[in-house]
């Protein structure tokens, strides 16, 4: 296992590994269940080294006007949120492995999260990336949306560590929500509940959380006894109250037989 805390050190390290035909596996939080951090690289290499990025864990720069920050890829979810809090900003991206996974891991696996209904996946937050490869550094710039050819960041998103080592990224931030509205809705029929979720998704209400648990999952989650499906529905905003949005959502829920307190 190798540890590096500077980009230049990673550049030198990858150059050394390429010279000796050593496979390098970037390691963030290690929370993936897909085996991507295992040393299963075949017989074509002289060896394998895991490159642990835990020392690249700082928020390097904050742009409060544009609500964005340049963050190192090895920052765990709680680490980056703690550093953003003094600026009264948040990334508000919460995959299930939030405490144990890193910004870089989220980007290269195109992660979703518990509030990924309103802001879908990590893709929506990425403004620019810096990727160290055996052939050099690929660094994109923060630019307005453009239709001029392929977007280089799309090569990095979902790359799973196959193209190089993601060392940092500019990401869009949000103001912490001040207004919230939530409801837990039960359905006697799962497929009717699924139809209701589709209607909610197409309604334009844009809930921040709209998660449907099947009857068995409600038992594992501790929110039911296995006799009903449960829909977790939530809205949040840093700007305005949400009673009207929730009221309309519950009207739609009622049309599909959903029950709530």
Regions found by a protein language model. Name each.
Residues 57-211:
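FAD-binding subdomain of flavoenzyme oxidoreductases
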């Amino acid at each position: 296992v190798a540890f590096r805390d500077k980009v230049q050190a990673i550049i030198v390290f990858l150059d050394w590994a390429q010279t000796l035909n050593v496979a390098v596996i970037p390691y963030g939080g290690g929370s993936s269940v897909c085996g991507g951090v295992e040393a299963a690289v075949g017989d074509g290499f002289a060896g394998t080294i895991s490159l642990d990025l835990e020392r690249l864990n700082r928020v390097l720069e904050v742009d409060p006007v544009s609500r964005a920050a340049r963050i190192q890829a090895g920052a765990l979810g709680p680490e980056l949120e703690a550093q953003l809090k003094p600026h009264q900003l948040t990334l508000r991206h919460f995959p299930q492995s939030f405490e144990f996974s890193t910004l870089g891991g989220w980007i290269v696996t195109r992660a979703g999260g518990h509030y990924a209904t309103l802001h879908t996946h990590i893709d929506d937050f990425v403004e620019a990336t810096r990727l160290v490869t055996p052939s050099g550094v690929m660094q994109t710039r923060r630019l307005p949306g453009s239709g001029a050819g392929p977007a280089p960041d799309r090569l990095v998103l979902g790359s799973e560590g196959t193209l190089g080592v993601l060392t940092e990224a500019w990401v869009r931030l949000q103001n912490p929500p001040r207004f919230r509205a939530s409801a837990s809705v039960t359905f006697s029929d799962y497929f009717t509940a699924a139809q209701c979720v589709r209607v909610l998704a197409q309604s334009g209400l844009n809930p921040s959380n709209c998660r449907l648990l099947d009857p068995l999952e409600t038992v594992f989650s501790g929110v039911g006894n296995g006799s009903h499906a449960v829909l977790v529905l939530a809205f949040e905003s840093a700007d305005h109250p949400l009673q009207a949005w929730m009221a309309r959502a519950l009207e739609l829920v009622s049309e599909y037989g959903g029950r709530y307190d």
